[in-house]
Regions:
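Glyoxalase I/VOC metalloenzyme domain signal
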Residues: 1-17, 21-42, 54-111, 126-144
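Short, small/polar residue-rich loop motifs at catalytic or cofactor-binding pockets
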Residues: 118-120
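A short, aromatic/hydrophobic, helix- or strand-capping loop or linear motif
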Residues: 42-48, 115-116
């Protein structure tokens, strides 16, 4: 890795919102998030991480068993689970029904079926590691 004087990895903006998820199957999670519209930012020097973007937000997937922890107690807690209890990743989509169909085809749990909530149409599901995801399709100015 190349670091600047500020300690930032070369080529990686310092002021981006980044969300990191520790996952049990890096390839499966990576593929799923790509199909949900995320873009891949290759980082060949970090084999146990996958960097993705969605707009200006970064999602960093790390292998739960290969990526380091900052202390032994956090590692123990992360591996015992449940993963991310209380955490919800919200992903906008242009086609909620197609995203819901993808979730079902993948055999992933849906915890709230699609419903209208006034400002958007939403549904909730769990990703392969049990992280809760809310998908939202915003209403157009005409209300559809």
């Amino acid at each position: 890795m190349r670091y600047s004087r500020a300690g930032i990895i070369a080529g990686m903006p310092a002021r981006q919102l980044k969300v990191g998820l520790r996952v049990s199957d890096l390839d499966r999670s990576f593929d799923l998030y790509l199909r949900l519209g995320f873009r891949h930012l290759p980082q060949a020097e970090q084999a146990h991480l996958r960097y993705l973007t969605f707009g200006h937000t970064w999602l960093i997937l790390s292998d739960v068993d290969q990526h380091g922890y900052h202390n032994a107690e956090r590692e123990r807690q992360a591996k015992l689970g449940p993963p991310g209890l209380g955490f919800v990743l919200v992903i906008p989509t242009a086609d909620l029904e197609a995203t819901h169909a993808l979730w079902r085809r993948e055999g992933l749990p849906v915890t709230l079926e699609p419903e209208d909530v006034g400002w958007a149409r939403i549904f909730y599901g769990l990703d392969p590691d049990g992280y809760e995801i809310m998908f939202e399709q915003f209403r157009t100015p005409s209300g559809t």
